[in-house]
């Protein structure tokens, strides 16, 4: 990291966003550009994976298993990714992770051509595509922590999150445009999604090249050599006390979200079957398939996130991190029950719900600041990785549980049906669990001292 002077409050001001990128260190700018590229790929693809699997002939149980495998990856990747980053530096770590993710997008692209191996290939692509997002988590946290003073961490994360969420706004709109000429049949969904994956591969190559060529590793802070499982156990035992109530609440909220998150696209496209028919005088009648409209909804969600993220991060400097994080938890918790009970075919109601859902992202910079803030310099990657390891290990079965509640299940010994399956029940239970987590954090969550 190139550092000529110690970072100041001005350097961490996210309101200077697109002028020398929030006036932060060059490394945060480079990280944000890479985040923009990869987030385009992730947002165009990951939110549609359940629809892709349905189009390839699977159902809710396989989709749930896919979600839980993703949770396994999220649990296992961040800690070694953070340790690798602390050991070899962020530049080389993120380059390797970026290449792996790009290959993963390519595997998804060719999966439909593999016949009976199509679904296994989708699972293989998942292990690869998540490398930058999950392996690189500790590295990205460490870069921001090195460049931003403790009292400005939320603003620093708001800077990177704003570029990342800008990609999350653009990505779904690209997906919506690519779905637009196609119908809602499975063959059309597969072809349109392959075009989306091709775009993701291109952005993956660009993002990897940008972070490798532009990032200055000169000021990377290196931790000690990774000592294996013993170090992992020590890191878990030595998690700062401030993180423990946050970890409990975050785990409950994420478990709830994990039960249903992968099914959001299926709710819109197949359960509600809601597209958009709009009479536009300038261009004539506009008709979007449910798949295309889902991309518009994701774009709307991200637009709200972008409009609120920076002001909320600044507000956190006045009111503290805890209220902001609690707000995000509440929106996470209540959204599933609202979505599953939306009236079928009502595009306006879905638009309002996804706009509301965008508020959950407003608390993410504060949430990340609350995680990484107490960490010692040189260990930010490991602390972040250890935190996410614990959370994501517990969250692993959530998507599979959601799939079983959606599709139903039988007694494996007798074949007798135990539960017929009900998407509304699955989403209702998810909301209940999320509200428990939100309440726990409201009661026991602690504030980071730099914000008191």
Where are these regions (language model features)?
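Hydrophobic core of transmembrane alpha-helices in multi-pass small-molecule transporters
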Residues: 118-136, 347-362
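Helix-loop boundary and gating motifs at the non-cytosolic
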Residues: 13-73, 242-297
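Helix-to-loop junctions at the C-terminal end of transmembrane segments
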Residues: 77-89, 179, 308-320, 406
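Flexible cytoplasmic inter-helical loops of multi-pass small-molecule transporters
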Residues: 2-13, 212-235, 448-452
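A membrane-interface helix-boundary motif in multi-pass transporters
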Residues: 179-201, 406-434
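C-terminal ends and interior cores of transmembrane alpha-helices
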Residues: 99-116, 330-344
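C-terminal membrane-cytosol helix-exit motif in multi-pass small-molecule transporters
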Residues: 201-220, 437-444
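C-terminal transmembrane helical hairpin of 12-TM major facilitator-type secondary transporters
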Residues: 322-364
């Amino acid at each position: 990291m190139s550092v000529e002077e110690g970072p100041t409050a001005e350097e961490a001001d996210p309101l200077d966003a697109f002028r020398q990128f929030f006036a932060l260190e060059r490394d945060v700018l480079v990280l944000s550009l890479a985040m923009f590229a990869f987030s385009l790929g992730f947002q165009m693809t990951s939110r549609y994976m359940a629809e892709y699997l349905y189009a390839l002939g699977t159902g809710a149980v396989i989709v749930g298993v896919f979600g839980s495998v993703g949770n396994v990856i999220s649990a296992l990747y961040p800690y070694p990714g953070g340790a690798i980053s602390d050991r070899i530096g962020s530049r080389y770590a993120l380059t390797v992770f970026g290449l792996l993710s790009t290959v993963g997008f390519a595997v998804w692209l060719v999966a439909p051509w593999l016949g009976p191996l199509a679904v296994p290939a989708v699972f293989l692509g998942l292990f690869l595509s998540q490398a930058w997002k999950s392996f690189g988590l500790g590295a990205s946290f460490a870069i921001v922590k090195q460049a931003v003073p403790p009292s400005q961490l939320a603003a620093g994360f708001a800077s990177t999150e704003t570029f990342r969420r800008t990609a999350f706004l653009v990505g779904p709109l690209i997906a919506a445009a690519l779905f637009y000429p196609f119908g809602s049949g499975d063959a059309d969904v597969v072809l349109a999604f392959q075009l989306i994956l091709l775009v993701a591969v291109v952005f993956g190559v660009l993002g990897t090249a940008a972070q490798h060529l532009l990032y200055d590793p000169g000021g990377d802070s290196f931790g000690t050599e990774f000592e294996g499982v013993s170090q992992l156990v020590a890191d878990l035992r030595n998690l700062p006390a401030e993180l423990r109530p946050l970890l409990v609440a975050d785990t409950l909220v994420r478990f709830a979200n994990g039960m249903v998150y992968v099914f959001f696209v299926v709710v819109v496209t197949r359960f509600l079957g809601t597209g958009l028919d709009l009479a536009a005088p300038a261009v004539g009648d506009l008709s979007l398939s449910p798949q295309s409209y889902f991309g518009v909804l994701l774009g709307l969600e991200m637009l709200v996130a972008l409009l609120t993220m920076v002001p909320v991060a600044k507000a956190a400097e006045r009111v503290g991190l805890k209220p902001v994080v609690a707000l995000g938890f509440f929106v996470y918790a209540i959204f599933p029950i609202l979505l599953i009970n939306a009236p079928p075919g009502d595009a306006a109601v879905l638009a309002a719900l996804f706009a509301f859902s965008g508020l959950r992202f407003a608390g993410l910079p504060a949430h990340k600041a609350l995680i990484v803030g107490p960490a010692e310099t040189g260990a930010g990657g490991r602390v972040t990785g250890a935190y996410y390891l614990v959370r994501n290990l517990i969250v692993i079965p959530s998507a599979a549980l959601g799939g079983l509640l959606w599709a139903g299940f039988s007694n494996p010994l007798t074949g007798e049906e135990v539960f017929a399956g009900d998407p509304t029940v699955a989403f209702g239970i998810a909301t209940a669990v999320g509200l428990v987590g939100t309440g726990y954090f409201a009661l026991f969550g602690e504030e980071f001292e730099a914000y008191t």
